[in-house]
Amino acid sequence: MMGSVELNLRETELCLGLPGGDTVAPVTGNKRGFSETVDLKLNLNNEPANKEGSTTHDVVTFDSKEKSACPKDPAKPPAKAQVVGWPPVRSYRKNVMVSCQKSSGGPEAAAFVKVSMDGAPYLRKIDLRMYKSYDELSNALSNMFSSFTMGKHGGEEGMIDFMNERKLMDLVNSWDYVPSYEDKDGDWMLVGDVPWPMFVDTCKRLRLMKGSDAIGLAPRAMEKCKSRA
């Protein structure tokens, strides 16, 4: 009886320190302590972060490999030069068209020449290939310049006999205006000294000059005709 009371008094006895400090804390089995639990959680949080970092690094590495493996975009073709004018026909095409036209026997090019008359304040331009003879040219000039009349003193195709000096001088003196032309040599000659096709090819311009001024051309025309003969 006394022993049990002493034990109870001992348990309820006040003393300095935490109660039960002299007793060994019983083992709590397999439960973890607070500090162990915190350390474990920290370790678990670090492991996924490391895994994510490694995954991101792998992804970046893979992307860089893909970019290096992919070919670069092909270079864009240079912009074409803007065509000026319409239709856009270049010079070499024009030359090809002209050569093809000549080879195919197309129409001949026009032979435009300027026509002037002494005392007339204006000029005319005609296409010699529109006419077939000197007579047709004379009629056309008569319509252009009413003051000009060309008599039919010539022979075949309206050609003038430049080999006969007397007839030539009579012809020049009988006309108020005499048709003359500048040939490729730069010499002024009387119209009708050569056959018509040759005249069309050699004539550069026409001039209806006064008969008194054309007298000086007669000897020169005779000399040139003799040299051609």
Curated annotation (Swiss-Prot):
Modification after translation (UniProt): Phosphorylated by phytochrome A in vitro.
Query: Which Gene Ontology molecular-function terms are recorded?
Result: DNA-binding transcription factor activity; identical protein binding
Q: What is the effect of changing D118N?
A: Suppresses the axr3-1 phenotype
UniProt subcellular location: Nucleus
Q: Please state every residue range assigned to the domain named PB1.
A: 110-211
Principal localisation = nucleus
What biological-process GO terms show up in the record?
auxin-activated signaling pathway; positive regulation of leaf senescence; response to auxin
Q: What induces it?
A: By auxin.
Q: What is the effect of changing L16F?
A: Suppresses the axr3-1 phenotype
Task: List the GO terms this entry assigns under cellular component, sorted alphabetically.
Answer: nucleus
Q: What is the effect of changing D183A?
A: No effect on interaction with ARF7. Loss of interaction with ARF7
Q: Which UniProt keywords apply?
A: Auxin signaling pathway, Nucleus, Phosphoprotein, Repressor, Transcription, Transcription regulation
Find motif (EAR-like (transcriptional repression)) and give its ranges: 14-18
A Pfam entry, by short name: AUX_IAA
Q: What is the effect of changing P121S?
A: Suppresses the axr3-1 phenotype
Q: Give the protein's biological function.
A: Aux/IAA proteins are short-lived transcriptional factors that function as repressors of early auxin response genes at low auxin concentrations. Repression is thought to result from the interaction with auxin response factors (ARFs), proteins that bind to the auxin-responsive promoter element (AuxRE). Formation of heterodimers with ARF proteins may alter their ability to modulate early auxin response genes expression.
Note in the entry = Increased auxin response of mutants axr3-1 and axr3-3 may result from an increased stability of AXR3.
Comment block on domains: The N-terminal half of the protein contains two conserved domains I and II. Domain I includes a slightly degenerated ERF-associated amphiphilic repression (EAR) motif which seems to be involved in the activity of transcriptional repression. Domain II is required for the correct degradation of the protein through the SCF-mediated ubiquitin-proteasome pathway. Interactions between Aux/IAA proteins and auxin response factors (ARFs) occur through their C-terminal dimerization domains III and IV.
| Quaternary structure note | Homodimers and heterodimers. Interacts with the auxin response factors ARF1 and IAA24. Interacts with IAA1. Interacts with TPL. Interacts (via PB1 domain) with ARF7 (via PB1 domain).
* Family in the record: Belongs to the Aux/IAA family.
State the protein's name.
Auxin-responsive protein IAA17
Q: What is the species of this protein?
A: Arabidopsis thaliana
Lineage, top ranks: Eukaryota, Viridiplantae, Streptophyta, Embryophyta, Tracheophyta
